């Protein structure tokens, strides 16, 4: 009754809410895209800097953000297409208000397409997170170029090993999930609070990032992430004796 009497107000609130959710989602995606390179930089260079990597990898982070937005729109479009196909198949049953062969066919076809689509999304997400983003970080390239390099040099011809990597990370993830759940229970759910959980489970996050980087490093010297660098000024100390003072800062 209230909606009928105040339809214009309801429509305004609804549209405003949708726009707000979209803006929050875009902001979260942007921060996540920039944050991925900050995390990689912190792990590779063994430092806790924020300002430097935020500015240094601005181009790569923004490129990843735009790439993520486009992919998100394609995912939404594909999902809508699958839903539309299912509705068209079931249309005879919908019009006759019965559940028969058309309805069953719609469920089978729609379910199969959706399952394949979900598996494709998982594989794509793994490729971007494990191979493409580190490639962008190391080669200092934008998203599309990072995609091409990662596809041609890291995935093509090595699909089997990449699948094994994903399976291994999945199994390790199950173990990490058990540890995280146990920790949350032991701390009476305090460990599940946003900031506390980020700090508490940071070693797990770092482990999985390092695991992926170590896999990539097997592809040759051009894919070396963990170089012998000075922990204070990040001077490249390759070829120098271990334990010697840094020629740049003297520490």
Q: What would you call each of these model-derived segments?
A:
Residues 1-17:
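Interfacial loop/helix-cap signal at membrane boundaries in integral membrane proteins
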Residues 35, 40, 94-97, 105-144, ...:
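Juxtamembrane transition segments at transmembrane-helix termini in multipass membrane proteins
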């Amino acid at each position: 009754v209230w909606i009928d009497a105040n339809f214009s107000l309801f429509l305004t609130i609804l549209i405003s809410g949708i726009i707000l959710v979209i803006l929050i989602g875009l902001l979260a995606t942007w921060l996540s895209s920039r944050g991925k390179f900050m995390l990689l930089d912190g792990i590779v260079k063994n430092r806790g800097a924020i300002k430097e990597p935020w500015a240094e990898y601005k181009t790569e982070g923004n490129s990843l953000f735009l790439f993520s937005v486009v992919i998100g729109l394609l995912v939404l479009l594909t999902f809508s297409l699958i839903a539309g196909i299912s509705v068209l198949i079931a249309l005879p049953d919908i019009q006759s208000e019965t559940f028969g062969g058309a309805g069953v066919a719609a469920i089978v076809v729609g379910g199969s397409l959706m399952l394949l689509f979900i598996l494709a999304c998982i594989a794509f997400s793994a490729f971007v997170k494990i191979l493409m983003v580190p490639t962008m970080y190391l080669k200092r390239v934008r998203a599309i170029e990072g995609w091409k390099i990662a596809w041609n040099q890291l995935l093509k011809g090595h699909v089997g090993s990449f699948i094994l990597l994903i399976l291994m990370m999945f199994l390790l993830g199950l173990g990490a999930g058990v540890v995280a759940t146990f920790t949350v229970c032991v701390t009476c759910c305090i460990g599940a609070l946003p900031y506390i959980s980020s700090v508490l489970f940071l070693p797990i996050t770092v482990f999985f990032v390092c695991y992926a980087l170590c896999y990539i490093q097997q592809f040759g010297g051009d894919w070396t992430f963990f170089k012998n660098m000075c922990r204070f000024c990040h001077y490249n100390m390759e070829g120098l004796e271990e334990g010697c003072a840094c020629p740049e800062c003297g520490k």
